[in-house]
């Protein structure tokens, strides 16, 4: 590709991307690199695309001959993202728009979070022949579009950017000789940012029980359609989503009529949000501007067939549920650029700001109508050395002849600054979580088997309505890579307590874990991060082992793109 910019002429776009990434400032607010160009006219928008496995300097030196040939072959098989797909994802246009530092920062964040790009940068090139105009260069690098996974008896194949069109195709098959039918299948299609509307749409079906069934010990077929539009930038006024599905149970293991739960249900969920003071934001600027938004959600779960067993007749999982909830948000958000939080060295955008959400609604469940109110506050604070803290607190509950299903939750995670140890990188985190349920009616007892419990716990003996977890993790990022794979060596320690809702939690027994392991990831590929871990559980309950070895894939973890999400009840789990 021939750039029309003097500083980029005759250069490999991959070298340019590498230089921009290497020189990109981090531990700074995301808008800072663009501020000196604020208000300048955008003359041209130039898109430069880099091959998936484009490597420079030290990587090329260690990746010659057969490995390089393999990378060239994979690049040949891959179809780069179409330039119009990138253009449809821009918040500005050439000739008529001017540079807004905050919109540029939000746009770079949006592009980096597209699931088919491994990285993206927006770079502003000043012009020598005029001082009031600039060229904007968008440089992107795709992730390799093909992927596969094998889990138990399931084989899954997927393409995250089919034909370079910003669309995803998933196919899966399950072969299990113990079930009937022996073969199960699943397929789905996703189109991102339809026609530049920033609406994502998906449609699909599954007969392999991977669409979040309503209960444990059941097997479901599901057909679904989903639409979603986030409030993806500060100046957008509306967002929302729609989910429709039809689901029914399958007796794949030929259970007797006394054990098989024969049911079917329809699910409909729609929500919308409206942001205020957008015009004021455009006039006064984005810095330190408090924003307001309201959102409304309607959801219904309608059973067309219920299990015939008496034990499930009044079980909340198998009864109709309908609710409508509204939310008012008061929030402020900017982004902070850093590295080595969840990823293995590429730029990450950390939200900085706060969100106050006030929620109210009405729910009807098992012919029981009740009112809900709740309040949540979240704050992300960035410190001068690049360390930051994310804090959340929430209180919510229902009213029906008194208060019931009250939930109080506190989350706090501190992320240290990034330390350099010779050529290694170190960042540690310390987290605290507290959860209590008061006057439970539908809420069931919690345990330690969740993300907010203890890593690797799998015990049904420990239950309660109050939980406290304290933990820490240190992540050591290796300076070397092998065949493009990067390595994070981690150590972790956690302690937790469970108790009943009416007792003093600190008098209960401590449960703990000590662990170490390694996480492996190739950021050019769309595969999940591979984690290998060894854990020791002193004082573990009798229904689980004291030593655990794990080999699992973990999903990519990222902070939320916007504080305005689909209104939810504060969960108790």
Q: Residue ranges of each PLM-predicted region?
A:
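Immediate N-terminus of the mature polypeptide
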Residues: 1-403, 414-573
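Amphipathic hydrophobic-ligand
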Residues: 407-409
